[in-house]
Amino acid sequence: MAAAALRARLNAHIFRMYAEGVVEEETFEQLREDGTATELARLLINEAYEILHDIDIRMEEPEVDIDEVEALTQQLMECASSVGAQQVKLACMHFGDFYEIKCKQGCLVSLDLVRNLYCIVRNDVEIMMQLEDQIAACGPK
């Protein structure tokens, strides 16, 4: 596929990410202009995966230390904010709300939402990175 067609696909994909609220446009556009969007997106994918894995381990313990889980959720919220993943950030905030009132069931439901939204962000960012790699393989503009 020609570089121009790949760029068009990339732009359409990123526009869809904005339209669906996967990433916040202003934040992500600033990162793209700075040339750091892809690097930060890779960090988000890796760090968020590790954090979610740590949360899963803690949630499987017989006595869940919800304070530890809340601290990990705060870390995840910071990661999500770095690339403008507002839906993930909001889901983390919902967890915090349930944590404040000590509602374990609400915490569990909100963690499921966090995981699902993270998967959406991860998949969309991976598609974006694949398109960028294909464009780079086409050579200079």
Segment roles from a protein language model:
Residues M1-K141:
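Two-component system phosphorelay core
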